Structures are given as C-alpha cells and as structure tokens.
Amino acid sequence: ASFAALYMCEGSAHPLQMMHADAINDLWTNTGERGERCMVVDVAGEGQDRTVVSVWDGLHLENLYVEAKSRGPELVAIIDSMAKMEKVGRSRIVVDCDGIGGMGVADYLKGCVRFHGGGKVMTQEGDEAANFQNLRTQCYYLLAELVNSRAISINPDLSEHRVDISLELEAIRRKDDMAEGKLKIAPKEEIKEMIG
C-alpha cells in the first residue's frame, strides 16, 4: 500500500493521514517560495542514531545533512561549520529541544531558537484561540496544509532521502479524539513505530 500511495499517486493509505500521497510525491517537482535561509536541527536522542540538519530557503528544502550520533561539542562544531557554509545566522537556526540532546546543543549554540514541541500554541493578533494540543501539533497541521497546497518544495538533488522523507510524512496522523476540544496528532513513538 505504501509504494502505491507514495509512487503511484493512489491516494492516502490511511484515513487519518494528514498529508496526501500525491502531495508528498509532488514535493520533488513543486516550486516552493524562496525567502530567508534557516536551519532546523533535530538532534539524535535516546534510541536515535543520527542527527538531521535541514537547510531551508523560504519554503524550499535546499539541503539535508545526516550526521552520525555525536557528542555535544563535536556536534556544535559541525552545525557551526554547516551554518557558515550555508550562510545561515545563529538567530535563524532552530534546535528541537524536546530531548536532552537538543537542550545541550542549544546551550552551546548561543542565539539559536529553541523549539519546545510540548509548548504553548502560537497565536497571531486577531486570531481566535487555537485549538491545538500543543506547539508540535500546530506545526504538523501547518506543515500538512503547506504540503497539501503544494507550497513546499524539495531540492531534487536530495533524492537519496526521498523514501525516508516520504515515509516520515506519510506516518504523521491526526488523532480521532476531540475529547478535550483540542486537535491532536499521533505521539512521536507511534510515528517512529510506523516508519520502522
């Protein structure tokens, strides 16, 4: 089912899947709006064997670095080197701080932006209170909206990561549970289990 959904554009494999299979497939041919460059760092944590650093030019994924699990200071030096090479300032580096590894890296990368997925939902002036469980959920809903509307693109030179990226995006599911009146997504552990 995954091959047909991802590569043959035969619709979503699961009713709670947030991103349509054809929209995921189109990421490689879309033309995402260019803008400010930034880096997003997902540090290897418990059970993970790699750190992933993505480099964005607006809504276009320009580059992707996958690093073997490294110790804090060594990883910070690698990220600093990448930032210089990619011309990304510290204030444009976002570090996922949900795990211990991310917190340590962010401590060394003075001036970076710390992302706390369990944190408070973002609101803009004039918006009604958002009904998301947390910031992580809000970001996944926004990502799904951007992917499904074909607003995001991925550099075709990154095709070696195509299967991994596609499987990860396909695994993001909304929860069919509005008991607290909040939109929710499947927990990280459940998503990781689906990916395998």
Task: Kindly label every feature range from the protein language model.
Residues A1-V41, V55, K175-K184:
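ATPase catalytic-site recognition across NTP-hydrolyzing enzymes
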Residues S2, Q48, N134-Q138:
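Charged, alpha-helix-enriched surfaces in structured cytosolic catalytic cores
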Residues T29-T31, T51, V105:
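Hydrophobic alpha-helical membrane-insertion segments
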Residues R34, G45-V52:
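Short, flexible loop/turn motifs enriched in small residues
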Residues D57-K182:
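Mg2+-dependent endonuclease catalytic cores in nucleic-acid-processing enzymes, primarily RNase H-like
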Residues K188-G196:
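Acidic, Mg2+-coordinating catalytic module of metal-dependent nucleases/exonucleases
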